[in-house]
């Protein structure tokens, strides 16, 4: 997670890699994008043994914007895989995703406050 909005990351295109940490951390590819509204990430060929997607969607609501996040994972069959993924990995992912969303909220609110502080016409 970045601590601030990074200008160099504001023009993503389909096919770009979104890495989950510094290399060699795994990554997903941008599969679809509607700028300013929706970003769809998906498993990269050879990068993951299970198909997965992660969608970020902005929905205007009264007085602001709601960020809707959905993820889907194709877990391998078997009791051992179920224990590893659903019992161990999913709760860890929940905590990490929640921290990421809180960071996004904090940066968005700080950015909105900074914009509001700029005099009109400046």
List each model region and its residues:
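Aromatic-acidic/polar surface patches that form glycan- and anion
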Residues: 93, 97
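Active-site rim elements
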Residues: 87-91
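Short terminal or interdomain "cap/linker" segment that borders an active site or interface and mediates
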Residues: 121
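Glycine-rich portal/gate segments that line the openings of hydrophobic small-molecule binding cavities
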Residues: 1-68, 73-81, 85, 98-118
